[in-house]
């Protein structure tokens, strides 16, 4: 119950205080302050007497009395001053506030700090009692204008000044005084008031005072002024007008550039600590500085990246920037205006680096003018070209309005004799073609006119632009080109002119562009090709990337503007006698067989039946390349068009050239042979180099059998080349996909039913192939899939032992194998002497399964294949802990935008704990008290910091394999011994401690401990199920940093854990989470109208969701996206086995009322499709889906590019594999971005 003081009691205290000596006053003040702690109100009659007696007490030389008044009395007395009427507060501001402001200059910190706190209290009371009047109603002296509404009620004889303005006037007097400490403390008071009152306290009146303090003679004042300005103007809630006014004042009052640069960078960048280049504060832009410089003088800015960032505060600030530049671009360029022109161009580039074109795009585009590229001086023209290259990249389609005006100007520059300017200008044209979306008529007319020019340099650049245009725009602009009268004829005429050009370099580039033209307009291209003479047509066919035997220049050259003579170099052609080539192949095969016998003596060999020839090798062609709207996009296109060969049907019209084999390792044998090599590197990759893994087999010799068509040979076979990243590139012909899966549960080894798919290929005369499964294999596949549909729980079966522990290969070449068995490149020791490819008989292969091996089949990109027990491979070679957390993994996670707040917080907490880190690694008993506190559930911040530092200073390396030396094993045992008896206690204690209801600071530090454990002690982690439960429990938090931490941690666990084991754990944790957080009852459950039911599920505003619903959606989204990431690391057989369970998860999520959950369900379905590449099989996992839902799922597959291609449009094997890897990478990024939407930001 609050205490009350009567008027008589307060008057008695006041009387004692007036009559007492200074020492006695200290006791009275302190006692009265204690009485006021529980008092809510004082009698109004005693307020003014105390306010009048306070100034002498505050100015008293008695230090103890002064300290008592400031610390023990004022914090409790001032809040009791009544706000209404305001006469008491006005008296306090007139009497007490000046005395308090004087004490800001006191040398003792306890004095000036307490005085500052009292001033803040008076300011808060002033703003609460009388909100400030808008500045428009005040005159220059601070008094009310005569016509304002408030002045009509005020006393006409004495203008009325509001309480906030009275408080501000006194504080400004202090800031404009001479005492440096008063200024410093006054700015601190100002910062506190702004943080408390927010927008109610205007900034404009303070900016002039603060700018003056930036140039104060005292260094302490200047430093505090910088910090104050940054703290006041950097928050996002600060109005842009205040920042713009501040920039104007910096220039108007000539603040030093070093001071202004630092402040502007910190205020406007949003991440000033990460900036290495200060902003350009060109306050003298309007002055004709350097007008007398001679033409030979080189300006300071001459490099593409030597541009300082320019930060723009508001659209009005941007308009002023452009307005100050306009006078320099009026009229012709002269000796007087070329230097300001260059500075203006560089400044515009700096604005783009500061993202002004993104924040204020409309104002930026309105300010752009087209006369900046007309300069003929080298540096100025070069800067103009840099700007014109960056503008389309940054603005994209918003730059379309300038394209038609700029292309003729840049086209003229392509004929300049100054090679540097010509190259830069045409690089800008390439950027415009790549990133803008204007009508193709503009580009085609510009390119066609360039091809008609007499200058060979212009023609060379024009055909490069023609190639770029066809790569970027031909596919999607085909209808526009054909619908525009005469446009397709103009394009055709341009090709005819360029193919007949007198310059060989122009003709060479045109031939490369022609085949892209041929893909889009095949009939017109055929007519054009048939009209050429024999020699020209022969050269054109030789440039066809589908038939060229050696890599041609890639389409990446379209974005470069090299010299025209660079295209004159022709690929060397070599001929070799057929007999010599065959003899060399036989010799290489024999040597490889001997080497394989010596290396793998006693090991089983898997020998497949011979495979007939398949279509020849061709180079990858860019088909249907989408137009990119960014530099990243064009880089992706260039990568797609790299000269790495892939296999696809060869047109029958082109002849296959014979090429010699450069090395014995690349010689192919008539038989597909798979040899398991015992090597220390076998667990990761074979000893083949990446170049060999990517190298294509050479084109076959002419047919030796009448039954084989042109380009087919009995020497054609299937070889498996292990790539450097663990992926296998399978040759053409009959392809067996091994799908015998080895999975384990609680250390026991099991096998899932074998599922072997084979593609029978039937070669046609036109080079295309129809692939279908043989009836027997299709029947077996259907049986396996049907049996798996009825499984409700994960079922791990023991394989039935084969008689004699052998597998036999059938006459159709069906070889059972497992993804966990290493398949290395090699050839057989003895080859059948047969030229027709018919081999009778069977090879019996012995294969003993290793009962201790553990491996979940991964997808081709991420799997490390295991061999059988005949190869001496240690158990648990590919366990959930085969690889440690590498710096590359951590760096890749830190670069993601979605969890930036967590990484900043983690670094901040690690830096705070660094003083506790000992110089040498501490012994294990040093953290025993900290572990005990953690187990009790009540650790302090220091306990958690010490545990985190101990984890980082005692890392444990991955468990060494049997092939590694004893020293590595001893080092592992020593590192592991440190954690004996400690690790389980730390891990379990941390996971149990991490609960959303914990203190935020302790919870964040606990997350740091968990990250240190995963990063440095991952080989010791056994219970990932407990860890998953803990992560789902943290999804109940509403703190964005905690949620971001769980997102980043699960992304890391997907990379380093066994995906099958993690998938089971995530499923279990998701079920547990959804059981704890059931879905709210749906009001539309009984609604028979499907349209009304669908509309009722739409959430028009996220603010309408209850906290329980937001928590459920956050965890649900987290689980679905995590499962999707695991799916992308699994192989097709495992997905087939787990499909029904995954389908049940998808179906439940698709029917969820939340749109974000439905979106996550479709993303999970897309992840499954990325692995299976069969939409029918994918949709069969969710049989309960309606036809409309299935159609929507297929639509999403097509839009995301994961829908399989059939018939004539089906990609070749190697090209398809490359595309599938890209699909998985893109889908992983999409899932990570979708997961970030579950972060609740309040």
Swiss-Prot record:
Residues 138-156, 548-567, 640-660, 701-711, 1082-1104 have a biased composition (Low complexity). GO terms for biological process: cell division; mitotic spindle assembly. Residues 138-161, 538-612, 637-711, 748-839, 853-884, 1077-1111 are annotated as: Disordered. It is found in: Cytoplasm, Cytoskeleton; Nucleus; Cytoplasm, Cytoskeleton, Spindle. Keywords: Cell cycle, Cell division, Cytoplasm, Cytoskeleton, Microtubule, Mitosis, Nucleus. InterPro entries: ARM-like, ARM-type_fold, CLASP_N_dom. GO terms for cellular component: cytoplasmic microtubule; microtubule organizing center; mitotic spindle midzone; nucleus; spindle microtubule. Residues 802-815, 824-837, 856-871 have a biased composition (Polar residues). Its main location: cytoplasm. It comes from the Eukaryota. Microtubule binding protein that promotes the stabilization of dynamic microtubules. Required for mitotic spindle formation. This is Protein STU1. It comes from Cryptococcus neoformans var. neoformans serotype D (strain B-3501A).
């Amino acid at each position: 119950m609050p205490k009350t003081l009567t008027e008589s009691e307060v008057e008695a205290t006041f009387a004692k205080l007036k009559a007492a000596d200074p020492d006695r006053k200290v006791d009275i003040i302190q006692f009265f302050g204690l009485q006021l702690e529980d008092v809510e109100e004082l009698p109004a009659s005693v307020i003014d007497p105390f306010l009048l007696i306070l100034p002498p007490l505050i100015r008293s030389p008695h230090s103890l009395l002064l300290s008592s008044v400031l610390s023990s009395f004022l914090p409790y007395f001032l809040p009791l001053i009544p706000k209404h009427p305001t006469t008491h507060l006005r008296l306090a501001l007139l009497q007490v506030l000046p005395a308090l402001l004087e004490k800001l200059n006191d040398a003792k910190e306890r004095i000036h700090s307490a005085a500052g706190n009292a001033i803040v209290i008076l300011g808060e009371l002033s703003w609460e009692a009388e909100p400030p009047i808008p500045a428009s109603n005040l005159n220059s002296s601070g008094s009310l204008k005569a016509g304002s509404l408030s002045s009509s009620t005020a006393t006409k004889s004495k203008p009325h000044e509001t309480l906030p303005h009275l408080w501000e006037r006194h504080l400004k007097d202090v800031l404009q005084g001479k005492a440096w400490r008063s200024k410093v403390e006054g700015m601190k008071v100002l910062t506190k008031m702004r943080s408390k009152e927010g927008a109610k306290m205007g900034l404009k009146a303070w900016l002039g005072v603060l700018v003056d303090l930036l140039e104060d003679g005292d260094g302490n004042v200047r430093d505090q002024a910088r910090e104050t300005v940054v703290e006041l103007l950097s928050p996002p809630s600060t109005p842009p007008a205040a920042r713009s006014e501040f920039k104007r004042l910096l220039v108007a009052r000539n603040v030093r550039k070093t001071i202004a640069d630092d402040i502007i960078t910190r205020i406007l960048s949003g991440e000033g600590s990460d900036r290495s280049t200060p902003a350009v504060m060109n306050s003298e832009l309007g002055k004709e500085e350097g007008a007398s410089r001679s033409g030979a003088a080189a300006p300071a800015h001459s490099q593409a990246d030597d541009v300082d960032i320019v930060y723009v505060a508001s659209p009005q600030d941007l308009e002023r920037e452009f307005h100050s530049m306009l006078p320099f671009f009026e009229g012709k360029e002269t000796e007087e205006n070329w230097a300001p022109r260059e500075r203006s161009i560089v400044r515009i580039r700096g604005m783009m680096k500061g993202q002004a074109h993104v924040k204020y795009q409309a104002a930026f585009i309105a300010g752009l003018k087209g006369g900046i590229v007309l300069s003929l001086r080298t540096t100025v023209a070069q800067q103009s070209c840099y700007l014109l290259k960056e503008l389309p990249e940054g603005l994209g389609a918003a730059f379309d309005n300038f394209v038609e005006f700029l292309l003729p100007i840049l086209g003229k520059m392509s004929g300049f004799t100054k090679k540097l300017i010509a190259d830069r200008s045409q690089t800008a044209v390439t950027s415009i073609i790549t990133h803008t979306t204007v009508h193709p008529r503009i580009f085609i007319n510009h390119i066609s006119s360039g091809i008609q020019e007499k200058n060979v340099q212009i023609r060379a650049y024009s055909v490069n632009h023609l190639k770029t245009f066809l790569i970027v725009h031909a596919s999607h602009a085909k209808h526009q080109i054909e619908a525009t009268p005469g446009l397709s004829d103009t394009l055709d005429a341009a090709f005819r002119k360029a193919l007949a050009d007198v310059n060989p370099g122009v003709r060479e580039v045109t031939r490369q562009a022609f085949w892209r033209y041929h893909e889009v307009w095949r009939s017109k291209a055929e007519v054009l090709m048939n009209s050429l003479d024999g020699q020209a047509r022969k050269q054109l066919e030789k440039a066809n990337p589908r038939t060229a035997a050696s890599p041609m220049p890639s389409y990446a050259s379209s974005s470069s503007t090299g010299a025209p003579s660079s295209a004159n170099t022709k690929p060397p052609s070599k001929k070799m006698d057929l007999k010599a080539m065959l003899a060399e192949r036989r010799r290489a095969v024999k040597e490889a067989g001997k080497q394989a016998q010596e290396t793998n003596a006693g090991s089983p060999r898997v020998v497949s039946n011979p495979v007939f020839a398949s279509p020849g090798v061709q180079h990858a062609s860019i088909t249907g390349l989408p137009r990119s709207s960014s530099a990243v996009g064009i880089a992706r296109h260039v990568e797609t068009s790299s000269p790495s060969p892939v296999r696809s049907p060869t047109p029958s019209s082109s002849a296959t050239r014979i090429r010699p084999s450069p090395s014995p390792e690349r010689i192919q044998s008539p038989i597909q042979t798979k040899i398991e090599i015992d090597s220390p590197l076998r667990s990761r990759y074979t000893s083949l180099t990446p170049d060999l893994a990517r190298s294509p087999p050479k084109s076959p010799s002419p047919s030796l059998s009448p039954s084989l068509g042109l380009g087919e040979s009995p020497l054609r076979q299937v070889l498996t080349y292990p790539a450097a990243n663990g992926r296998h590139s399978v040759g053409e012909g009959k392809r067996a996909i091994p799908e015998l899966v080895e999975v384990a549960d609680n250390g026991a080894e099991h096998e899932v039913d074998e599922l072997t798919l084979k593609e029978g290929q039937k070669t046609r005369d036109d080079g295309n192939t129809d692939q279908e499964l043989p009836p027997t294999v299709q029947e077996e596949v259907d049986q396996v899939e049907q049996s798996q549909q009825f499984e409700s729980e994960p079922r791990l079966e023991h394989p039935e032992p084969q008689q004699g522990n052998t597998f036999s290969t059938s006459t159709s070449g069906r070889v059972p194998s497992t993804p966990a068995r290493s398949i290395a490149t090699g050839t057989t020791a003895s080859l059948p002497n047969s030229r027709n490819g018919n081999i009778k008989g069977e090879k019996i292969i012995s294969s003993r399964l290793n009962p201790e091996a553990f491996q979940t089949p991964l997808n081709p990109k991420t799997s490390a294949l295991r061999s059988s027990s005949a190869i001496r491979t240690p158990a648990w070679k590919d366990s959930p802990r085969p690889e440690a957390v590498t710096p590359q993994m951590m760096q890749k996670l830190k670069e993601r935008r979605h969890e930036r707040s967590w990484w900043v917080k983690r670094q901040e907490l690690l830096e705070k704990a660094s003083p506790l880190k000992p110089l040498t690694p501490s012994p294990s008993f040093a953290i025993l008290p900290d572990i005990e506190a953690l187990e009790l559930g009540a650790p302090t911040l220091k306990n958690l910091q010490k545990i985190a530092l101990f984890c980082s200073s005692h890392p444990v390396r991955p468990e060494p394999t049997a092939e590694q030396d004893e020293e590595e094993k001893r080092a592992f045992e020593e590192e592991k011994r440190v954690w004996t008896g400690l690790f389980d206690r730390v891990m379990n204690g941390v996971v149990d401690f991490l609960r959303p209801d914990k203190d935020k600071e302790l919870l964040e530090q606990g997350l740091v401990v968990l990250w240190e454990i995963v990063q440095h002690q991952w080989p010791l982690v056994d219970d990932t199920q407990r860890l998953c439960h803990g992560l789902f429990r943290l999804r109940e938090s509403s703190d964005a940093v905690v949620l971001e931490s769980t997102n980043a941690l699960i992304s890391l666990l997907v990379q380093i854990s066994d995906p099958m084991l993690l998938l089971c754990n995530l499923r279990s944790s998701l079920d547990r989470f959804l059981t704890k957080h059931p879905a709210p009852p749906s009001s539309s459950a009984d609604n028979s109208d499907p349209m009304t039911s669908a509309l009722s599920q739409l959430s028009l505003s996220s603010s309408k969701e209850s906290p329980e619903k937001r928590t459920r959606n956050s965890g649900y989204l987290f689980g679905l996206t995590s499962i999707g990431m695991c799916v992308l690391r699994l192989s097709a057989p495992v997905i087939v086995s787990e499909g029904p369970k995954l389908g049940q998860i998808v179906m439940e999520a698709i029917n969820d009322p939340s749109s974000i959950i439905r979106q996550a369900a479709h993303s999970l379905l897309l992840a499954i499709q990325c692995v299976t590449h069969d939409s029918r099989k994918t949709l069969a996992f969710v049989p309960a889906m309606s036809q409309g839902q299935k159609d929507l799922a297929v639509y999403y597959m097509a839009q995301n590019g994961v829908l399989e291609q059939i018939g004539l449009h089906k990609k070749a094997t190697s090209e398809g594999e490359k595309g599938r890897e890209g699909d998985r990478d893109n889908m992983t990024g999409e899932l990570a971005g979708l997961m970030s939407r579950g972060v609740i930001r309040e």
